[in-house]
Amino acid sequence: MTKRCSWVKMTNQLYIAYHDEEWGQPLHDDQALFELLCMETYQAGLSWETVLNKRQAFREAFHGYQIQAVAEMTDTELENLLENPAIIRNRAKIFATRANAQAFLRLQEEYGSFDAYLWSFVEGKTIVNDVPDYRQAPAKTSLSEKLAKDLKKRGFKFTGPVAVLSFLQAAGLVDDHENDCEWKNSN
């Protein structure tokens, strides 16, 4: 039988596929990184399962996470999303998506890509942590605090150290698969 991290909800096929096919896989595509960062910001105060279940609706609402298109969304477009029952209708998070797209574009301009900026924090290599049980893993680290501080300085919203650590794990910069998970250190 396949051994996965114990946090995976085995009753939800989206959750299983997310763990097996995405979570912890080193990600270098700026658009995919933007989508993942947005998803982590939506999670604040909610379950990851809720965000995953609404992922496709978010993609449709935010132009497939085309960064320039999201950065150019009007206040009216964003306000209209508050009426969309298929997404998380939190005004601050919806407006943060546009602000984050704008900040993302500035970082792309400065570094050539968000990928180059992001991976510079780990010197281009995945950090593999010892995680016998995810319940004992820290919610934030010095790395996530450093990146969160820099993102905030650059105008990003909803990117505190806990959300940032989740993002780093999901994007494969930090391998926090449990030690007995078949996906541990698979990259």
Descriptions of predicted regions:
Residues 1-187:
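HhH-family (HhH-GPD) DNA N-glycosylase catalytic core used in base-excision repair
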